[in-house]
Amino acid sequence: MYVAQPIEWTEKGVVMLDQRRLPSEEISYTYTDYREVAKAIREMVIRGAPAIGVAAAMGAALGVLHSPAKSVEDLRAEFSEICSVLAKTRPTAVDLFWALARMQRRFDELCAKSSQLSDIKCGMVEEAKLVHLEKKATDQAIGEYGAEFMPREGQVMTQCNAGALATGGIGTALGVIRVAYQQGRKIHILVPETRPYLQGARLTAWELHKGGIPLTLITDNMVGHFMNTGKVRAVVTGADRIAANGDTANKIGTYQIAVLAKENNVPFYIAAPISTFDLSIPDGEHIPIEERSAAEVTHLQGVRIAPDVHAAHPAFDVTPARYIAAIFTERGVARAPYSSSLRALAAGPQPAVSSAP
């Protein structure tokens, strides 16, 4: 089954598939400078919390690899600036900060072990590759846990794009769907278009179609109608940040889907890696919500579709934990009360990762 490759580390640099051009064009760019990677994250060449984390790790490694520093101390100072630049790109996706913190820890370990810049550079590149490899294993585990909750047959709704394009593996929400479909479950996916950036229409529909999984594309204002038919058996989405109490930030429009699911007795699930947990914040009120350009609302692929008026564009909303039936992770399934179940999973052992490519 086809699996998209949004990002790869190569000898020539970090290669990213430009997701802004999908589905009409499949164009990739090769980046050799961490500033270019930061710009690619900010401008959504790559998007999706786990994939942003992979990109940040690779950006940090690129910065170290191509640093002109002549000493470890000079490299330390430069690495601080590298992480600062990458950290300013997307404020809501906690995987970004998780990845940078991990790369910082590895950098400190390498500097403590060796004064050879070549050793440090090599170690950072290997760590970035390992982050990507772990994301692939994580997606598979999430998919296997979550698939058990999918119906034997019927409609499953998702939101935005939480597939391979968003993670670098098989996807979180779409990973659950993919594994369930491969198990022989006769599911049909309802894909809201996800205005204003159309990640559902452009990316999720593209991934599912390429993978041979049956789907129907719907507009965002059709969600309630389809819920009310009684044919939707489950909803599964990804997440960009999960607070300690289970409140979850995901792409704008997710909250209203969760409310409609509750009203229509449809279980609403979240599929996300442990790295998306932010147990340092008590609830969703503390999750920063990224405000993107109003032009992404008033224009569609460069064409103005609205008059020259004020437009709001919060990129995410927060779904309260009370609407979430379960959260699928690579270490198992969390259920309410999330304040205890999330911490238990976060403290658990990480599944083993194969070193095979």
Task: Annotate the PLM regions.
Residues 171-182, 258:
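Histidine-anchored nucleotide/phosphate-binding helix
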Residues 5-111:
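Long amphipathic alpha-helical segments
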Residues 30, 34-37, 49, 53, ...:
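Generic structural signal for well-ordered, non-membrane alpha-helical segments
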Residues 95-156, 187, 191-235:
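Ligand-binding beta-strand-loop-alpha-helix segment within the catalytic cores
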Residues 43-56, 90, 96, 158-169, ...:
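Conserved phosphate/anionic-ligand binding catalytic regions in large, soluble enzymes, centered on
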Residues 186-187, 192-357:
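Conserved phosphate- and dinucleotide-binding cores of soluble alpha/beta proteins
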Residues 45, 64, 68, 83-90, ...:
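Structural signal for hydrophobic packing residues in well-ordered secondary-structure cores
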Residues 17, 55, 59, 97-99, ...:
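Short beta-strand segments
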